[in-house]
């Protein structure tokens, strides 16, 4: 059970006052970084700005308290924007809350069932494809506010967005665009000045001051969303129906997989920064609890945020106390300073997310894979990317995983091979080769199987043939790591064929997994235990005795 025990309980032994001070300072700095991102991501997701802070506070607390990483910072991330926007557009806020809670439950189950290590089986091509797809979708989704387009709403579909922008291109607000460009410029230049204060916060303060004091005609959070709620989030159980639960299962599963991938990736990155090892299953449970309570308190899906976690480490955070401090700081900001957030220009928040989208897309890896990866990997990469952009993340991940699995099985089936040994007097054997070969009678045929024998390659077993003078067939299996039920079916068919011809099947060097499957299947008893040998020499000696 130690692997499910929250990391907080482990690191508090010998906790010093000096580290407490460092954790508090790191938590406050991370809260300042998280503030503009949480608000911007909530708005981009189609919900109110307060819900972004609710998520960072509630989910962030549970992720830090119950998670398996010392330094993980949880909250809303750009990866969820696309899927949240689609859920809200189709099913409303109740649908989003149900999906968030279901995703949390799935994550908790994944953690309890020790699925933490299974996330590594999600192919790199899929994560690269959907990450770049999310970046493109997120980038395009900000153009309305960045240019100040006079549109009542933005369609959820990618192509519909482009068409809608084209129809309203004449409504561009030049002032809003200039303010947005100023915000982008500040975020690009500020890191060269100092990395202690995030450029996004500086951009928000500067552009908000310009718009407010110059009384510019630019949409702000207050003009779009009205007065902001500065009270602590209230516990709320949504109206749940079985139909809504069924509708939300698929997006909830996608949210859970995304949260697991991003949080564990963040945990691995932070491990390298602090020289620690996270508990992946405890982390999944912490992520699950964070999402369950985020939904119940009106928040949106959350996960570990790589950038905020890295900032926590760089500023001295070394225990979950830093993450909890980040939540407390955001709570104080929510209760005291939230009315000031109404003054923030919408174009500035759009600019923040444009920069986030540009930074999250790993185009270098994307194009490198397109140039150098095997054709099957390129197919998965490109398919996942375009499905994310033109359909949605749910479809992209589901089809991407299935496609990757099918192409992987095809590749494995192509590597599986069965070769017949040659006789020393074969016409195509050179004298040098003949010296290396064992001289065996023509009444014995030897076949060597290479590669895993599973359903995609099982039919190759039936390629093992015999001549009219064959009395024994030796099958060497030292290069077969695994077999499945389909391969066993083919072996049974081969055995029946051999019996009809009075041919003895002899097996050599059967590895542990194939031997276990054969034993469980009853195949060893059927063929005869005496026909299984540890090595090819013993198998050939036995075969020669039989055919004398």
Regions picked out by a protein language model, each given a short descriptive name:
Residues 1-426, 490:
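Transmembrane helical cores of multi-pass ion-transport proteins
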Residues 526-542:
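Short acidic-hydrophobic, aromatic-tinged amphipathic segments that line or gate anion-handling sites
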Residues 73, 507, 532:
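Conserved SAM-binding loop
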Residues 328, 514-515, 534:
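Short secondary-structure capping/turn micro-motifs that flank functional sites
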Residues 359-526, 544-548:
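The feature marks cytosolic C-terminal regulatory regions of anion transporters and related permeases
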